[in-house]
Amino acid sequence: MTLPLLGPMTLSGFAHSWFFLFLFVVAGLVALYILMQLARQRRMLRFANMELLESVAPKRPSRWRHVPAILLVLSLLLFTIAMAGPTHDVRIPRNRAVVMLVIDVSQSMRATDVEPSRMVAAQEAAKQFADELTPGINLGLIAYAGTATVLVSPTTNREATKNALDKLQFADRTATGEAIFTALQAIATVGAVIGGGDTPPPARIVLFSDGKETMPTNPDNPKGAYTAARTAKDQGVPISTISFGTPYGFVEIDDQRQPVPVDDETMKKVAQLSGGNSYNAATLAELRAVYSSLQQQIGYETIKGDASVGWLRLGALALALAALAALLINRRLPT
């Protein structure tokens, strides 16, 4: 929860929870205050002549006299929470991640069930994805059909990726497994260069396709898509799959209409085996929404941030109010 002027305020993820032991001190102060009030009442009752007491103190003490003490205790509680170091989730841009954009350029991408065509829609959405991706992420591009080709090695230069997207060419057949293996190799290569730590940079493959694998026909083949997805899982590289198109797509080949329905099941299985997520889109707007969602997932990481400042500010406010109330009500600072 974030409050105006105070900032993020949470009651979880305490970095120094042992500071809560200070609550025993606060409890002791409360007990001492209660004992002092009881002793004060006993001293007043020692007056044998109640008429004399009423003439000396004609007005009974107001209950408002406890407000400064209550505010003081509240400030101590708030300061204790602040010292315990509450934290909250903070999203920060990644600057070491690698993303491989893998796009199917098989003949089925000519289908016009998605206006103006599957290929053109894919190019437009992918370029938007490149523009919106966090600048520090290294983005690479692979086009695949019967073979896979690295068009752009992972780089922070988005223009290189967008220029390559404009030059995609159709080809025959679909070798999804080879495309995934090629992406893993590209990730390993760039990871060795930009490592900068004890662990390789986080990486992800974004696989865009509209049809099932044809080379090989069995995805569990050593070079098949499922085998490649399992390898990606072993290497800690999740695959986000996007199946694009409708069940009614077709292309004209040698003056014959060939149905090219989208294959959601294969893409879902690839994502599942790799530990990633699967998406489907039947329009350009849906595809852009998918890429936007991926950009938010890939472009940022969540870390724990300090959330104690808000509690400190509230504590300071309560302490100031305690002093003000003491001066206005009791004509002295709270003791």
UniProtKB/Swiss-Prot annotation:
SUPFAM superfamilies named in the record: vWA-like
Pfam families attached to this UniProt entry: BatA (PF07584), VWA_2 (PF13519)
Transmembrane segments: 18-38, 67-87, 309-329
Listed GO CC annotations: plasma membrane
Membrane disposition: Multi-pass membrane protein
Principal place of residence: membrane
Gene3D superfamilies: von Willebrand factor, type A domain
Residue span(s) of domain VWFA: 98-294
CDD domains registered for this protein in UniProt: vWFA (cd00198)
Top-rank taxon: Bacteria
Record keywords: Cell membrane, Membrane, Transmembrane, Transmembrane helix
Annotated localization: Cell membrane
Cross-referenced InterPro entries: Aerotolerance_reg_N, UPF0353, UPF0353/GerABKA_families, VWF_A, vWFA_dom_sf
Family: Belongs to the UPF0353 family.
Protein name: UPF0353 protein BCG_1543
Source taxonomy: Bacteria, Bacillati, Actinomycetota, Actinomycetes, Mycobacteriales
